[in-house]
Design a protein with these regions (language model features):
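N-terminal pre-Walker A segment at the start of P-loop NTPase domains
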Residues: 1-25
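Short glycine-rich substrate-engagement loop in P-loop NTPases that contacts/grips substrate
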Residues: 53-81
Length: 345
C-alpha cells in the first residue's frame, strides 16, 4: 500500500483549464481518445470541484507505479474513507473494480478496452470550433483557418520530436508511407513490400501494427462503398506535414474535412463521385479547396445521377472561400467555405 499512499499524498494539481465541448457525467466512466487529445485536462477540470484529499489519482504510466499495487486498492480505499473519487489514468488492460464503492474515472487510448458497468466517452482532438475558442486570437477567420492548417489538432501534428518518443520504428515507417499516400487507396501488400526495402519485418507485423494504430486513434480507415478498398487518413490531419516534406494540400484538406465530420459519430464511405458520404444521413461531402463556382456547377451535373441513385439529396462542396447554393432535380448542392462548414454544425 506504500505506492498507493505515495500517489495519494503526491497528487497533481487539479486546476481548471480550458473547457471542452464534452463533459464527464456523474457515473463510472472510461474516457477514450488518442494521446494528447486532452483527456487529462478534461479530468482535472472535473476533479477541481473536489478537495485534493478526496481524490486518489493513479497514473499507470508513471515509472514509479507498480501494477501489483492495484490488488490492494479496495483495502486502501476502505482505510481512507475520506477519498470520494478514484481516477486511474493511462489504463491499457481491463481492471477488476467490482469491490470499489466510490465513483471511478478511467482514461485510455485503447478503443477496444471495455469494463463491465462503465459507460464510455470518446474524446477527440480539437475541432476547428474549439481551436478558435481556445486560441483566443483576435484574427480574421481566414487567418485562423490558416493557423489551424499549420498547427494541426494536437501536439503530435505540431512537435516532430514527439513522434519518435511515442512511436516505434515500424509504426513511424507505416505512418510515413500513409502520409505520402494520403487520400490514395491503400494496399497492405504494397505497403509491406515498400517497408521491406527499409527494415526487417513481416506481413503479420505490418497488419497488426496498422490495426493497433487504428485501435489507438492514430489512423482512421474509410471504406469504398462497393469494393473491398480503403483509404487511410489521420485522426489529426496535422500529422501529415510532420511526417514528410512533400506538399499535397488537396489531400491534407480532405483529411481536415474528415476530422470535422468525426463529430457526427457516423460511418462514412467514399467512391469516385464523393469524397465522403453517410448512408445514414444521406449527405455527401466533396473536398474542393480551390475549385471556382463554375467548375463546381459542372461537377454537380456530372454527379447528379449518382446522387439520385444513392438517395442523396444534399451534397456539400467544401472550399477555402467560395460560397453558393443551388438545386438540380431536387438535390441541394451547397458550396461552403471551410470555416462556415465547420462552425455551422
Amino acid at each position: 500500500m506504500k505506492i498507493l499512499n505515495f500517489f495519494y499524498e503526491n497528487h497533481p494539481k487539479f486546476e481548471i483549464s480550458y473547457e471542452r465541448k464534452v463533459q464527464i457525467p456523474l457515473c463510472n466512466i472510461i474516457i477514450k481518445g488518442p494521446k494528447f487529445s486532452g483527456k487529462k485536462t478534461l479530468i482535472f477540470n472535473y476533479l477541481s470541484q473536489f478537495k485534493p484529499n478526496e481524490i486518489l489519482f493513479l497514473n499507470l504510466h508513471d515509472t514509479r507505479f507498480e501494477n501489483q499495487s492495484l490488488e490492494h486498492l479496495s483495502n486502501f480505499l476502505e482505510k481512507n474513507a475520506q477519498i470520494k473519487f478514484l481516477c486511474i489514468y493511462n489504463v491499457e488492460f481491463a481492471l477488476n473494480l467490482q469491490d470499489i464503492k466510490i465513483p471511478i474515472i478511467i482514461s485510455t487510448d485503447k478503443k477496444d478496452l471495455h469494463i463491465e458497468g462503465f459507460q464510455e466517452l470518446e474524446l477527440d482532438y480539437f475541432d476547428f470550433e474549439e481551436f478558435v475558442s481556445i486560441s483566443r486570437k483576435n484574427l480574421p477567420i481566414n487567418n485562423l483557418v490558416g493557423l489551424f492548417l499549420q498547427s494541426g489538432r494536437s501536439k503530435l501534428g505540431e512537435k516532430n520530436i514527439l513522434l519518435r518518443q511515442n512511436f516505434n520504428t515500424l509504426e513511424l515507417e507505416i505512418l510515413k508511407y500513409l502520409a505520402l499516400n494520403l487520400g490514395q487507396q491503400i494496399s497492405i501488400s504494397k505497403l509491406f513490400l515498400e517497408l521491406k526495402k527499409r527494415l526487417k519485418t513481416s506481413k503479420d507485423s505490418v497488419y497488426h501494427t496498422i490495426k493497433e494504430l487504428e485501435n489507438t486513434y492514430i489512423i482512421h480507415p474509410i471504406s469504398h462503398d462497393e469494393k473491398k478498398l480503403q483509404k487511410i487518413y489521420f485522426r489529426d490531419f496535422g500529422l501529415r506535414n510532420n511526417l514528410c516534406i512533400q506538399k499535397d494540400f488537396a489531400h491534407l484538406f480532405e483529411n481536415l474535412i474528415l476530422n470535422e465530420l468525426f463529430k457526427f459519430k457516423q460511418e462514412f464511405f467514399y467512391n469516385k463521385f464523393f469524397t465522403f458520404y453517410s448512408k445514414v444521413s444521406k449527405i455527401a461531402y466533396i473536398s474542393s479547396s480551390t475549385l471556382d463556382i463554375d467548375l463546381i456547377k459542372l461537377r454537380a451535373k456530372k454527379i447528379l445521377s449518382k446522387s439520385l441513385e444513392l438517395g442523396i439529396f444534399h451534397v456539400v462542396f467544401i472550399t477555402l472561400s467560395s460560397e453558393d447554393s443551388f438545386f438540380e432535380q431536387g438535390v441541394k448542392f451547397e458550396v461552403l467555405p471551410f470555416d462556415k462548414f465547420s462552425l455551422g454544425f
